[in-house]
Each structure stands twice: as structure tokens, then as C-alpha cells.
Amino acid sequence: MSAAIRPLIAGNWKMNGLRASLSELKLMLEGAGKLSATADLLICPPATLVAAFAQKLAADTGSRSNSFAIGAQDCHPRASGAHTGDISAEMLADAGASAVIVGHSERRADHGESDALVREKAEAAWRAGLVAIICVGETQGQRDAGQTLDVVGTQLAGSLPDGATAANTVVAYEPVWAIGTGRTPTVADVEQVHGFIRKSLTQRMSGEGSKVRILYGGSVKPSNAQELMAVADVNGALVGGASLKAGDFLAIAAGCP
């Protein structure tokens, strides 16, 4: 991890959580103060909870609003219109979100999202004043075929819009085969891919590319967080299941050097 880049620990709750889950957010906020000097924290609940979570964050006098934020898991590329069931970035911002995940592997697989669509969604996030967390990563078959860097490079080139900065963009590497499986790449594998992403960003964005946060996502848990966070060019984590419990999420954040 680069000492010059403040780490971000982002929790993706996926399709989990009801209003009763505010109790977990309360515990996270209570523990966040101890970690405010260590990392920025972000929780991305389902869209149905974004407003409630943002209101809780705003009302909590013990929270550190500059280091704890609420995000969302997806957005439509258009600001409004006849798109039944979809949610725009503007709506998410209005609900209190400050960031949105785009291009998650589950969206790419379940909904057939292309790099071009992910790019549009990232641009929509910026339009609404949100940080775009752009996800890239290979499947097991692609990894076995030795295509990891080719796949990640192609996704990054196609999904990252022109105009990206360290302020409006985060990149998350999530090897698809590691998500929710309990399996993680070796430290050497993570370092290779994150180094490749960093090089790609600096080639495209010049000096700005050296400042963009690159998160690792894929079965991150308290037991492996410290080792992963110590890897060069790993600037935080995109956490799935382990972010549903305050204790686990805070323990992962505590693993940041």
C-alpha cells in the first residue's frame, strides 16, 4: 500500500439488508472514530436503504463525516426517463450517496453489462457529483487460460471514461472466481494485477493515475486483510459478505497500515 494514498474500505452489501440493519450501521459509526486516522469507510447498502443510512450518518454526532460515507451499488446512465425499476445517479445523490459502484462482476454477468455501458454509468456518476467505483476482474476460465492481464486491461480501457481523476474515480480489482468463495489470489498475483492497473492508469492519466485508489475485492475478511492491505498498489478493499457485520468490517479497516 502506498503511504501517499489514503486507503478506502468499501462495503458492498449486495441484495442484503432491511431497515433493522441500521443497528449494524450504528455499531460501525461508533467504531469509525477510532479508525478515522487510518482509512476512509464507505458502506453501499441496497438502494432501498441509501436514504435511511445517509440520514443516520448525518444525525450521528459521533460519526466522522469526512471519513465515513454512504454509497450505492449501481446506477442507470440516464438522469431520468421511462426506465421502470432503474435508479439514476441523480436520485442516489439526492438520497445522500456520495459514491456508486459500477461494473461489478455480478452486474456484468447477471445483466450482461458491457464495458461501454459501465463507462456510461461512470460518466453518469460524475454528472451527479458521485465518485465512480469501477470494477474489473477475470473469471476462473480466463485466469486458467492466462488471460488475466488482457481481460483486466480491456475492461479498464473500455470502462474508464476520459476525464477520470483521483477525486472522481476509484478502481476495484475483483477476481470473479474469488468473490464469495473463500478463495483469494496469492499476494504475488494481487501485486502483479494491481501493478498492471497502476501502470495502465499512469499511462492514460499521467501523474493523476498515480493517485487513484485501487481496491482489492474478493473474499476479503479480517483474517487476510492485513496481508492484502500491505501489498504494493493495494489502496483499500471492496468488501462483500464481511461488510454485513460491523465487527468484521471494522476489523478489516483496522488492517490498513
UniProtKB/Swiss-Prot annotation:
Pathway annotation: Carbohydrate biosynthesis; gluconeogenesis; Carbohydrate degradation; glycolysis; D-glyceraldehyde 3-phosphate from glycerone phosphate: step 1/1
Main location: cytoplasm
Species, as recorded: Rhodopseudomonas palustris (strain BisB18)
UniProt xrefs under SUPFAM superfamilies: Triosephosphate isomerase (TIM) (SSF51351)
Purpose: Involved in the gluconeogenesis. Catalyzes stereospecifically the conversion of dihydroxyacetone phosphate (DHAP) to D-glyceraldehyde-3-phosphate (G3P).
InterPro entries: Aldolase_TIM, TIM_sf, TrioseP_Isoase_bac/euk, Triosephosphate_isomerase, Triosephosphate_isomerase_AS
Originating gene: tpiA
Name of the protein: Triosephosphate isomerase
GO molecular function: triose-phosphate isomerase activity
Keyword terms: Cytoplasm, Gluconeogenesis, Glycolysis, Isomerase
Catalytic activity: D-glyceraldehyde 3-phosphate = dihydroxyacetone phosphate
